Design a protein with these regions (language model features):
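Non-catalytic N-lobe/flap surface of aspartyl protease domains
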Residues: 23-225, 282-308, 352-353
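Short, surface-exposed linear segments at secondary-structure transitions and domain or protein termini
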Residues: 140-150, 216, 227-235, 328-343, ...
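Extended serine/threonine-enriched, polar tracts that run as long, contiguous segments within proteins
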Residues: 253-272, 279-282, 290-294, 310-312
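A short acidic-Thr-Gly-centered motif at the start of a beta-strand
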Residues: 62-76, 238-261, 347-354
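A short acidic Gly-Thr/Ser loop motif
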Residues: 74, 81-87, 265-271, 278, ...
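Cleavable N-terminal signal peptides of Sec/SRP-targeted secreted and luminal proteins
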Residues: 4-24
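Aspartic protease catalytic domain
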Residues: 20-35, 314-440
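Flexible, small-/acidic-enriched active-site or ligand-binding loops
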Residues: 201-261, 335-337
Length: 440
């Protein structure tokens, strides 16, 4: 339980492994700051000297695949995926202090992977916030899940645990946290940091009920309501997409979506973005020299590593530019006995598991370009789940500057990697003239 009415918990984003390029955000603390200062380094730091708040949770970024927050569950610290795309809490692999355990078994299925176990109750601590008797899934079996667990940051109506046992403690942790701290405004704000390819760099923050000071102007930005209005997820209406200044046609398969819009899930638990095929082709077809690979169930693009497109999205007001570094992922492959570097598309055609409740799944490669505020509305009430819920964005990408800096940043990072492959040798099935194969 927080001792201050506007308590927050912050996450230091630590990059591990091969990451994307850019400068790390430095959140500078002052006497009124809820943030903390951090620099590039190779190990997480919990240095909160002279900060004005008592809650600090470290976060790591595993090869830009997922953002992990250190959360204490039942007396043990776990590195949990911060996931706005789901609502349940689960952990695995350790003996923890459990208040009580049920005989209710549950299997949670995600776009990739699953986790199963029994529902139990324990104390959960997020920074200085402590939620007593929180229901969670005590997992004993996982499939394609690399982290210690997932911290779902979505609505009650999406919680599989709450549907299973129908108790107040079974609601998602954010709903219980806001109810136990009624003076705290019920929103969370999230900044995901981009890091350089070959460095481990900290940066970024998540706060509850307050904004990081240098992003406080987000309070005056438009609030985009959930769309459709019956949505149980963090989905909003995408009203515009442009590539090099040209509009991309938007259509929706979602019932209730307005004509000319597409329903977009803003999902911190997904690394890339999964969007309609025509939108993918519009992005990479605009980059000269790109090759569309369609073979053996794969559907992606190989892109010149120094090629770029001007991509931006609008949700009803100004267009939000996407840093061109986000459009591709650096990869290596072996042709003969030699390793080479290629760049593959980061915006991918929709997964079959995306479902009919969204058209665009915008993950971390979108969220790193904005400061995102998730307003829960009345979502702490079972009687009025997500009425009034909305999302706000403040752009973090200066359009002119990011395009100007792209060549320099990408060139610098390529210096530490194997040589670029000659893309003229790659066929549309992903094979090369010399017998190698590039996979997504």
């Amino acid at each position: 339980m927080s001792s201050t009415p506007f308590a927050t918990f912050a996450f230091a984003l630590i990059a591990c492994g091969k990451l994307l390029e850019s400068n790390a955000l430095a959140i500078i603390r002052d006497d009124h700051s809820i943030g903390f200062y951090f620099n590039a380094h190779y190990k997480p730091t919990n240095d909160a000297t002279n900060t004005t708040f008592g809650s600090l949770v470290s976060v790591t970024s595993e090869s830009d695949l997922e953002y992990l927050g250190q959360v204490n569950v039942g007396g043990h610290d776990f590195n949990l995926v911060l996931d706005t795309g789901s609502s349940d809490l689960w952990v695995t692999g350790q003996q923890i202090k459990i208040n009580s355990e049920t005989s209710d078994n549950l299997n949670l299925t995600y776009g990739i992977g699953s986790a199963s176990g029994n529902i139990a109750y324990t104390t959960v601590q997020l920074g200085t916030y402590q939620v007593q008797n929180q229901a969670f899934l005590n997992v004993d079996k996982t499939y394609q899940q690399g982290a210690d667990g997932i911290l779902g940051l979505g609505f009650i109506s999406l919680s599989m645990i709450e549907k299973k046992i129908k108790t107040k403690a079974a609601r998602p942790i954010m709903a219980n946290l806001f109810e136990q701290n009624p003076t705290t405004p019920n929103f969370m704000a999230l900044a995901l940091e981009r890091t350089t390819d070959n460095e481990n760099t900290s940066g970024g923050a998540i706060t509850i009920g307050e904004y990081v000071p240098q992003f406080k102007d987000v309070s005056g930005t438009p609030k985009y309501p959930l769309a459709p209005s019956t949505s149980s997820r963090w989905t909003i209406a995408l009203s515009g997409m442009q590539v090099n200044g040209h509009d991309v046609t938007l259509k929706s398969v979602v019932k209730g979506a307005k004509k000319g819009t597409a329903i977009s899930l803003i999902d911190s638990g997904t690394s890339l973005a999964y969007i309609p095929s025509n939108a993918v082709d519009a992005i990479y077809g605009a980059i000269s020299g790109s090759i569309h690979i369609q073979s053996n169930g794969q559907n992606f693009w190989i892109v010149p590593c120094l090629g770029q497109a001007n991509l931006s999205f609008s949700f009803g007001h100004d267009y939000l530019p996407i840093n061109p570094l986000e459009l591709t992922r650096l990869a290596t492959f072996t042709d003969g006995n030699t390793q080479y570097t290629v760049c593959t598309s980061a915006f991918r055609p929709q997964l079959s598991s995306t479902g009919s409740d969204m058209d665009f799944l915008l993950g971390d490669i979108f969220m790193r370009n904005v400061y995102s505020v998730f307003n829960f509305g009345n979502s702490t009430s079972n009687n009025d789940d997500d009425k009034g819920a909305s999302i706000q964005f403040l752009s973090r990408s200066n359009k002119d500057q990011v395009y100007q800096d792209f060549q320099q940043q990408r060139t610098q990072n390529l210096k530490n990697l194997p040589p670029l492959y000659d893309l003229s040798k790659i066929h549309s099935d992903g094979t090369s003239s010399d017998g190698g194969r590039v996979n997504s």
